[in-house]
Amino acid sequence: MNYITAVITVRSGSQRVKNKNLKIFCDKNLLEYKIEVLKKVKKIDEIIVNTDSDEAIQISKNYNIGYKKREPYFASSECPNSEFWKNIAENTKSKFILFTHCTNPLIKKSTYEKFIEVFEKNKNNHDSFNSVTDVKEFLFLNKKPLNFDPSKSPNSQDLPNVIKLNFAINILTPSLMAKKKSLIGDNPFFYNLDAEEGYDINTKLDFEFAEYLFKKNRSQTEL
C-alpha cells in the first residue's frame, strides 16, 4: 500500500468559472500545472486525479499518473461536500491522503515538502493536517461583530488571530476522512500559508489575478 497518495479533484461542472480546472492559465491548464508540481514533490508515492471529465482523464494518462472516474452524482452541485469527501476516501487506497486542488496554483514544490515534513514530525499528536490563511478583517455575522468591539475598534493589524481553511493542502487517513465525512479531524494541525500561496480561484477575477501573480513570480521562484 502507498504511504502518501496525492488526490486532485476535477469536475467539469464548475459554476462560477466554467471548466476552470482545464482552462488555460498562462500557457497550460491548472490541472497540468498542479500535476507537474506534485510529480516533483518528495515522499508522494502516487498521484490520482478524481474526475468526471474525459479530458482530465486523458491528461492524467498523458502524465502517466492514476485517475478515478467519478460517478455523476458526486460531481454534481446536488452532492454536499460531506458525501463527496466520504466518496473520495472510500475510493483511495493509501495509508494517507494528501488532498489538494488545482485552484491553488501558487503553491510551490518546497511548500508541499515542508508541509509533509511537519506532518511526519507531528502525526502522532494530530489526526489531520490542514492549511489555513490568516484573516485580518472586520467580520460580522447576523449584524453582530465577530472579532472586534465597534466601540473600541482596533487597527486591522491588531485584530485577533482568526484563520480560515483554504483547503489547499490536507493530509489525513482515508478511514478518518470517511468516518468524519470531512478533511478535518478531532485534533487538527493548522499549517499557515501566506495569502499568496493560499490564494484560491473561485471567480473570473480570482482567475485573472492568480494568473497575474503566477506570471510575476515565475521568474523569481520555482512553481
Task: Report residues per predicted region.
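N-terminal nucleotide-binding beta1-loop-alpha1 segment
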Residues: M1-K18
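A short, N-terminal amphipathic alpha-helix
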Residues: L30-I47
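Hydrophobic helical membrane-anchoring modules
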Residues: Y191-N192, E197-L223
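Conserved core of the sugar-phosphate nucleotidyltransferase
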Residues: F84, P105-E197
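Residues at the starts of beta-strands that form the adenosine-phosphate
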Residues: Y3, D45-I47, D127
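Short phosphate-binding loop-to-helix
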Residues: I48, D54-L98, L106, S110-K114
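Short internal beta-strands
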Residues: I47-T51, S131-V132
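Conserved SAM-binding loop
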Residues: K23-I24, V49, F99, Y199
